[in-house]
Amino acid sequence: MFSSQNNSYMMMMGGGGIGNINNNQFYSPIISTSAQSFNSIVEWKRDIIRQLNDRNQNQTNNYSEFMRIYTDLLKRERTLNDRTLLYEKEIVSLRNEKKTQQQPPSGSSKMDSSSSSSSSNRVSGMGSTIEEMEQKLFKLQEDLTNSYKRNADNASSILLLNDKNKDLQNELMSKEIEIERIRSTIQQDLDSIKRLEMVVIEKENVSQIIRDELSSLQTEFLHNESKVVKLEQENSSLVERWLRKKNEEASKMNEANDFYQKMVEQRDSTPAKAAVQLSESISNLVVKLPDANDVPIPIVLERGVFSSEAMLPSKAKKRWTGHNSEIYCMAFNSIGNLLATGGGDKCVKVWDVISGQQKSTLLGASQSIVSVSFSPNDESILGTSNDNSARLWNTELGRSRHTLTGHIGKVYTGKFINSNRVVTGSHDRTIKLWDLQKGYCTRTIFCFSSCNDLVILGGSGTHLASGHVDHSVRFWDSNAGEPTQVLSSIHEGQITSITNSPTNTNQILTNSRDHTLKIIDIRTFDTIRTFKDPEYRNGLNWTKASWSPDGRYIASGSIDGSICIWDATNGKTVKVLTKVHNNGSSVCCCSWSPLANIFISADKDKNIIQWE
């Protein structure tokens, strides 16, 4: 009975998925690890199977020797049982034979004495054999009992080991859960580290912006210090001259009073003599003006008369080097007598258009100036820079009034809404509106693409149009900060400039890297006219097109140094100006003055050309 229990226990152990015993090795009957099936399973299933096989290997190695011993004991038990049964059968047969011999039949008394004696001898020999067999049987029963005891001990050990294995499995599962939790915590910590690294990078960028601004302010401060010294010296000289002139005027006034008193006294006595003395005294009172070299007299430029028809340029009149590096932008003031240019030498230069002489240099930027514009009253100049800031200078004095910081990318464009408000567009995909009286940003508009240029629509400044790197023109309500219209397919290349029509407030002109210019009606958002020419190639991301003040012509510079001029009314090419700018030097900007009688262009090779 105990043997059958052990056999059923072995069947339970072998059939329950723990393992089978075969040639002293332990194998899992559940998981197949053949090469063909293993390679056909996806990677995550392979990992699970590999982990289960590792677990089975770890769990079976501890019991393989024990199971082998247990199997040997079972075999010995079966052998002993077979031998015991055999001996028991022999004993039974011997006992039966002995009983038969002890009770002979009735005819047996007639046997002879010799056969009786031989039978008794054989019975006595068999009795000794039976005793030996009984002793062996007793021994075998003892061995069998001991084997049962050992099997019972082994079974209890197996149960204990199973319990221990379950505990270890539970502990392993808890450890795996803990490991998974720790992994999740580590991943969260890594994500936090990445976020903190991004914050650190952002803070470093802000710090770099502040350092650049500090450097520019220090440069501006040193420049202003030298200007202050010069102005103080000039002021002292002017005060001295003013006092001297006041003293001279006072002395002349005293002489005039004395003369008047004398004339009153002599009026009645000798009228003729008094008239002669009066004429002599008046001639003595004539004040000789000081020489022009002694007293600086401000030069007032002749503004000229507005021409109803814009000049069509044909040849170069003047040519000069504008900057120490390539030129990026230029702008006229409202009456056309001043021209501001910005370049890669980090400064804005103001030029007298009539004489072609430089009037002032505006400093403070730490990188290239990429956009300039005059305020409506011409008192200020706005310049935007690649140092992520925009600056405002006083036109007459050349002093910096404001430094507008807040963008985190290059500021590509800036325009005046009025004398106290400006708007800037940046590579950081934002448009910012600024209050110049308070000196800070009043609104930030997120435009989802780098802004290359923008214009103000209408006089109120509430509506804007901007051109972007993603080939789109966007129209904005600055009060809401939301786009009112997006023209995403207006061009096939990025927009390089947007210009208001000087004669029609409902039209704007766009220029693009797809080598075309287009007039857009801002009421219907339709393209009215497209301008292109085989010789026109827009070669720069900041190429600015120009509209003549009378609205008749449109001009833009090409990558080969030529300038194309179109008729705005029919889109036909009127003229192509060549062989003036260096061949291969892109013309970055060209413009008519507001008086329509001057046309100026600039290129990457630092040249400024005035046409006639």
Swiss-Prot record:
Molecular function GO terms recorded: Atg8-family ligase activity; protein-membrane adaptor activity
GO CC, one annotated term: phagophore assembly site membrane
TM region positions: none
Pfam short name (any one): ATG16
Cited CDD domains: Atg16_CCD, WD40
Matches recorded under InterPro entries: ATG16, Autophagy-rel_prot_16_dom, G-protein_beta_WD-40_rep, WD40/YVTN_repeat-like_dom_sf, WD40_repeat_CS, WD40_repeat_dom_sf, WD40_rpt
Region described as Disordered: spans on this chain: 95-128
Biased composition (Low complexity): 106-128
Keywords: Repeat, WD repeat
Coiled-coil intervals, chain numbering: none
GO biological-process terms attached to the record: autophagosome assembly; autophagosome maturation; culmination involved in sorocarp development; macroautophagy; phagocytosis; pinocytosis; proteasome-mediated ubiquitin-dependent protein catabolic process; sorocarp development
Domain of life: Eukaryota
Repeat found in the keyword field: yes
WD repeats: 322-361, 364-403, 406-444, 447-486, 490-530, 535-576, 582-611
Protein family according to the UniProt entry: Belongs to the WD repeat tipD family.
PANTHER family xref list: AUTOPHAGY PROTEIN 16-LIKE, AUTOPHAGY-RELATED 16, ISOFORM F
Purpose of the protein: Not known; disruption of the gene for tipD results in morphological defects.
Name of the protein: Protein tipD
Gene: tipD
